[in-house]
């Protein structure tokens, strides 16, 4: 996104499209056109539910954060990418209008129809009011923004290529962290109320306005949005959004994203949001917080009670709060995400308002509506009461959820025409969740007001340039499809029209989507050259980085399109499918009939998706796509159309097959996908199924799976900031679509590359791919979905990465990986990760707890852990991939995919192939899931593999299956390549690859064999490895990574260490199991992350404490053992681990060839955070050294270790002096802490690790004379002591031990001989 300063003006592909549309000019425009957001939005809506779709289109866009691209496409795309330009405001507006719905929509399920109706009405009123305000605001702002955008565009336009990218990179590099963090930090808290609309707009604006900053912002925004969307989208959104995959995200995003967007927007554009109280967003808490958070009289007693319980003179005691929060039953990663979203003041400690926010978000999340951003809480008139088993007081207040639903219902009424069906369908299929989704969903779509406003907004937007532009652009681009699309689009714009046409259109869109994919794929290939220029900003770099530059754009575009398109279209479709078996048939019927037109729509959808993607990552891609897409669409469209029409004709067959496949074939394929389907709801339509999967995921078991997909969508959306948006959905879809979509991609690519005939063959091959997909179907079922999701994630990650990388925020790029680790991108990534976690949490307890350790510990890890359940695996896969792999594997997947795609829709091909080879992958993923840690990466890898496979497939369209086999083998490299590419985009990736590969190989040296699946596992491990690898690989980024990680760790670790320390006694085992996987993996690649050790440490702290184990161990420890030997043994291990940590830090810093880079790394927040962690480790060694002396335990090995540690430490001090981090000698002098024989309770006071007095701190405080020694324990973590297994520990000792030595503290006893 950031990459596309010119295009997105800070948006990204989507932004670019919007911008292009508005001011981005032709360049952007293609994206807009390609994106065809309005239509795309329409598409997705259509897909979601025919009736719903039509209405949804306008509103859906608003409704779906993801779909964000749909109407947002016009607006959203603009919003995300270029929308800020002309359309952006409109989009923003529509978005805004929908934002409320979005936010509200998810809760639907929990309320009765009457309640929903009431809510809907209330929401409608509110919405109408807001709409009026927003309308004025929007118009006013639109002018300003457009002016600005045009200005920016005119100034940035020339730079769209490398320059823009460089600028964006510079800006992002400079501001990404701050921005991301800022956006994340502030927007989240502050993006609550009415802000959504304007904020989004603002966001769009920012996107547009701030060419560099904006891009950054967009990036952040998207990221934020993605994150937010992710959480809410997944839980909240998805159920509702079920109907609209895109919508799911958008719902999430709309509410969350919108809020998030607003946040970011607010932050960045707070100025711009004149009437919307943008600034508050920067004021993280208050402005956007609902009154019941800061108004004491409105705060529920339950909240107050918890506050009283946890409040201490020094503030809220995290240790006391932890068990209460854990009693919510939410996965730790989810709680970690909520925490990360709410904790804006003091890392590790919550303020009263933040506590209320956390409780409210937990309550919302428990209702199945991921509270991915505090802003979402504004939808609740009253504070939602969380259900905390540890707290009798808290009773859930259904009303709060209704608040969300109202928006849905509000829309619902307007949408009643088509929406009711959808809503009903949704409800039916979704079941409870469906109901929620449907009501929320329908409402959202229904938000006719929204629709109308959106329509109006949209029209304005269109008038503004986006909608018209997009539409026209699309038309122009699509040429054929253009007219149909335009009409569709317009229909989409006009809810009523769309409503009617929606069904047909929907099918069309589905087809269209693929058409788009195909077209894009084909055109992309053909237009590759152009895209590089366009997407060139981002892609160009990537493309250039990757030889497949064009392919990549294609790939990315495709992936994203597929993601977006597929996602959007299919999600919608699926939603329809998922939503109701009826719909799918309708869709099916519609699909074939509308295929021709559907193709167009599909394109639109794709474009929408693209926009989404664009908005996400593919903003570039989108732009890419858009320029390519238009051609693609046109060319492919024609092909597609012709192909499409004769569903079974070779090319047409392929297209239609794809489309139809999606519908029928895919329905079959996707029936399997349906399998995938665990999200069986998806079965009805293949691609729809994909979406259905998404939807189903979202809603049901499918909900679960769908959620993952949806989550992905949300994730996408969330990650969208990254490449989250379409990618995720796309991935799932891609996976399912993969055959169709990827085939489409391949086919289209091939079509465009090789022509219709080839396209047909390709399609056929791809269709086999589709069959393969079927093969994958099973694979897909569990794995493909995950892979797809993964891919989406991967794409997203890639996109994210691209964005980051392109943003010149390599660190960002890496950080994303780290971010996955929840480090560098603490805010964005962490939030992302958290959101992912949240989503995962939404997805399922399995994922949650799978992820929980990791999540908290390592969002990335959590991402990796996620693959605990099959569906969850998918979810997680995408999710996990997203978070951890998101940066790495996912990125890899995506990136590679993109790359491949760029090289001919390879991405899809690989995807498909992967899917084909995916069976093992699926298994792998599942297995990996079990690996908890590995699984995430596995999934990611799978995604990668898949992508790779697809790539191969693309390469060998005709020998698709063979390709699968051979590509499987290649996959490892592809995966690796991908990873590399993601990493470095080839060069970087190559370096990375080794790390990834190394991890991979280490984990699964036979990635080639199972290519996707094994690689995935490896990669999963690799993910960590990758993370770690990444870390090492980042030499230059090492710091960033490290800092990122450490940073994450610092706040995360602090929380973790607090939580973990608490965890030690409380949640150790739960955390541990997951964390252990993480840790194992982390540990397996310990050197890769010095930071990681810390991070890992926190992880481990959380994860490792296995209470039972510890107790057993304690039994052994406390038992009469050869004390001296045991002390020597335990300390030897401790010092050995500490030496590794310190050495890793030293080697990492020594490995940075450039002193300026090294200094920058060390002085960065993350670098300092990391080094402080190393200092803590060193301080632990100093304490242990005293313990060794005190107990007179002598051993050559210990002496040698201490010497080595001091030697490395002295070397490391030189680096620390660069950041004034060199610890005061006194802080390393713990002699005052030594327990002497005469001391009473000496054994009770002795730390189980170092045998020093755990209370020495307070004692020092009593003795001012020992001011300096007091410093030894004056860090925040020093103030913690933990009691575990009958022993007390210094928090830092226990933390280090658990994270770096083993999960169970040693429980050493002070010898009596003293």
From Swiss-Prot:
Short motif DFXDF motif 3, span: 775-779
Gene3D superfamilies: EF-hand
Skewed-composition ranges (Basic and acidic residues): 976-990
Family annotation (SMART domains): EH
Biased amino acid composition, Polar residues: 462-496, 1001-1019
Region named Disordered: 178-199, 460-498, 972-1026, 1073-1102
Keyword set includes Protein transport: yes
One GO CC term on file: Golgi apparatus
Residue ranges constituting the EH domain according to the UniProt record: 295-388
Full protein name: Synergin gamma
